[in-house]
Amino acid sequence: YEAGGSSAKSNLSPKGNKAKLQGDWLQYVTCINDYIEDYNPIIGRQEELLRTIQILSRKEKNNPLHVGEPGVGKTALVYGLASLIERHEVPECLEGCKIFSLDLGSLIAGTQYRGDFEKRLKAVLDGALAASPAILYIDEIHNIIGAGKIDKGSLDAGNILKPYLEGGKLRFMGATT
């Protein structure tokens, strides 16, 4: 499994992954499960973590969104969840899930033509769907709802995400301030 990822994570070393994933979409995501050994355990957020697991375990409306001030630990909850998944301490419906963190910087960078952003995002969504069971984590999700929108008739990320949200094809987690 060769993952792209943000430069902030370049000094971290991914652990060996059982399944080799392939595709151009990997340059826009980082598999959090591969990096959990490099992070400290989550402490004092069990209630929020349990609630996140409950939401992800639902059959419908199963996409949690963490809202809070900067630095309160919204992303830490995602790493805590990945740690629980790797230790097999989650419900059966979440067993074996890979959590992919979307790198918005690389996804948006260089999208100078109308439709480039949508094409890249759709490739990421299709890739994550093919890697199922998977959860796509979008930090600062407010930045992409409306991104790429030029006029009333054009697509934006919200319209691209909707088909994947319907029917639980792919699970999402979001965070915003």
Regions found by a protein language model. Give the residues of each.
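Substrate-gripping "pore-loop 1 plus following alpha2 helix"
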Residues: 116-121, 146-167
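Histone-fold recognition with a strong bias for associated Lys/Arg-rich disordered tails
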Residues: 1-108, 117-131, 135-143, 167, ...
